[in-house]
Regions:
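Polybasic/polar functional segments that serve as interface/processing modules
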Residues: 1-42, 50-87, 97-101, 108-119
């Protein structure tokens, strides 16, 4: 893989930390995709959804407060329909439910090992 900022152990710890923070704010249909062997973009994609913009904001804010690392980049926070928190090795996608159903991002990575969570 390309310029990794964490070790595999650190990445998996960050994933669990993000999952815990997202579920604290009732993220729905949370999915962790292990894309390490499929792309150089990241080791993991975390995808979750929420029904309202305030809930999306709460999930994103809780992840940002509850993780030891700051995201390298944030995209979509102004509109709160699809927010990307880029932790380099871990990409977090927080969707409004309708947006997630429309884009079906997880279908693009259907062959990735996955783990599902729900609050």
């Amino acid at each position: 893989m390309s310029n990794k900022s964490t070790t595999p152990k650190q990445s998996s710890e960050l994933v669990q930390n993000i999952v815990d923070c997202a579920l604290e704010k009732k993220a729905e249909k949370l999915l962790v995709l292990d894309v390490y062997n499929l792309t150089t973009l990241a080791d993991y994609f975390i995808i979750c959804s929420a029904n309202t913009e305030p809930q999306i904001k709460a999930i994103c804010d809780n992840i940002r407060r509850g993780t030891p690392h700051k995201p390298w980049h944030i995209e979509g926070y102004e509109k709160l329909s699809w927010v990307l928190l880029d932790y380099v090795d871990v990409l977090v996608h927080v969707f409004k439910t309708e947006e997630r159903e429309y884009y079906k991002l997880e279908k693009l990575w259907d062959d990735a090992p996955k783990k599902e969570y729900d609050y």
